[in-house]
Curated annotation (Swiss-Prot):
UniProt entry keywords in alphabetical sequence: ATP-binding, Kinase, Membrane, Nucleotide-binding, Proto-oncogene, Transferase, Transmembrane, Transmembrane helix, Tyrosine-protein kinase
Source domain of life: Eukaryota
Intracellular or extracellular location(s): Membrane
Organism: Mus musculus
Major localization class: membrane
Name of the gene: Styk1
Annotated protein name in UniProt: Tyrosine-protein kinase STYK1
Any one Gene Ontology molecular-function term assigned to this protein's record: ATP binding
Keyword RNA-binding belongs to the record: no
Length: 429
């Protein structure tokens, strides 16, 4: 207090013996200390406000990620990535259909087909929310001879969201690349509306219709084309597993493995199609609840019925159902169980009985696919080994025979699927 008191006395011009000055000195100290504290607080507050305003200005001036989605640094790099099957994302800032197509089309340059090379639209196959399917013929520089394709068209009037989704699906095929057991993209026309996506045409068509035709052939004895043996079922099944392995390598799964979602060539080479669920996983990281609700319940694994996240283990369960479909020549699964009761049926630890046309070896493979716990089901590689081992001793002579013909409407009711979904023989995206 001595040095501070002396200083305050000097400021007040007081003598050491002045009693009144001592009182004034105390009053002075009471005033100056709070004043200094308030002043310091105001200076600190001003500095904080200045730093905040400065940060806000710099944030507004610097270009942020809003309105874009991982746009590559250079256009040349984007085109190079697209050519090598890498994931290429498009700018989202375009607010018009025309602007979006101008930005998207250069990145799909290697897939573009001049419209004049689309020679003929033969017939409409199906019309749905994601576009209309047609049979068409086209030529390319590599294939000057006309070839049949399935053309998917997105026609006016259409909004920006639908256009972005259509282009996204083309990009998804580009990202996947080629695999002999997946339906291939043949080209596209995206510089203006209507937009076209051309996919390979697979004859005779979808596997479910093929299996039903095998029944008719047995009834009428019309030749050998549609004769199917146990060994051929293993042949088809192994190739479907290879397609699923290919998807898994890209961190994807199919989500709806079924005979209706497989196309078959005349040499019995299967092509997995209807990749819409895999596209959703690729684009959004998960399957939307709206899309999940459209999948027939009888093909779903228990965890899917319980609304748990989908995975490749669910595809393994569905693969067991596919084997059942093939060995019964297209019978609906769980024929005695209503679709809405399938979860309760499985919760009682019940599975389908062995069909009379099914060997014990094949039924054992089905049962390991239908284990309740997804972790106890075999991996794709293990399942492939089981099929290869079983096929070595499989019957290649006896033709599978199921004399009853299928009525599609009755089948749809028992299987729990929409009748219109099996009214045409092509299932593509």
């Amino acid at each position: 207090m001595g040095e501070k008191g002396h200083l305050s006395r000097v400021l007040l011009e007081c003598s050491l013996s002045d009693k009144l000055c001592v009182v004034r000195e105390k009053q002075y100290e009471v005033i100056i200390v709070p004043a200094l504290l308030v002043g310091g607080f105001l200076i600190l507050l001003a500095i904080i406000l200045w730093l905040f305003i400065r940060g806000q200005r710099s944030q507004r001036q610097s270009p942020g990620p809003r309105g874009t989605a991982s746009v590559p640094a250079s256009r040349g790099r984007s085109q190079e990535a697209a050519g090598h099957g890498e994931k290429v994302l498009l700018p989202l800032k375009e607010t018009s259909v025309e602007g979006f197509l101008r930005a998207a089309t250069p990145r799909l340059a290697k897939l573009q087909v001049p419209r004049e090379q689309l020679l003929e639209v033969l017939e409409q196959i199906h019309s749905g929310s994601c576009g209309t399917l047609y049979h068409a013929t086209m030529t390319t520089k590599d294939h000057p001879k006309p070839k049949s394709v399935v053309l998917k068209a997105l026609e006016d009037p259409v909004g920006l969201q639908e256009v972005q989704d259509f282009i996204g699906r083309i990009q998804f095929y580009q990202y996947l690349g080629k695999h002999k057991n997946l339906v291939q993209l043949e080209g596209c026309c995206t510089e203006r509306l209507p937009l076209y996506m051309m996919l390979e045409d697979v004859v005779p068509g979808d596997l479910l219709s093929f299996l039903w035709t095998c029944r008719r052939d047995v009834m009428t004895m019309d030749g050998l084309l549609y004769d199917l043996t146990e060994k051929q079922i293993y042949h088809i099944g192994k190739q479907i597993l290879l397609a699923l392995e290919f998807l898994q390598e890209k961190h994807l799964f199919h989500g709806d493995v079924a005979a209706r979602n497989i196309l078959i060539q005349s040499d019995l080479t299967p092509k997995l199609c209807h990749l819409g669920l895999a596209y959703e996983v690729h684009a959004h990281g998960a399957i939307s609840s709206a899309r999940s609700s459209t999948i027939p319940l009888k093909w779903l694994a228990p965890e899917r019925l319980l609304l748990r996240p989908a995975s490749i283990r669910g595809d393994i369960w569905s693969f067991g159902i596919l084997l059942y479909e093939m060995v019964t020549l297209g019978a609906p699964p769980y024929p005695e169980v209503p679709p809405t009761s399938i979860l309760q049926y499985l919760q009682r630890k019940k599975i389908m009985k062995r069909p009379s046309s099914c060997s014990h070896a094949m039924y054992n493979i089905m049962k390991c696919c239908w284990r309740w716990s997804e972790d106890s089901r075999p991996l794709l590689g293990q399942l492939l080994q089981r099929l290869e081992a079983a096929s070595r001793s499989a019957d290649d002579k006896a033709v599978l025979q199921v004399p009853e013909l299928v009525v599609p409407e009755l089948y749809a009711d028992v299987a729990g699927i929409r009748a219109e979904s099996i009214s045409y023989s092509f299932s593509v995206l």
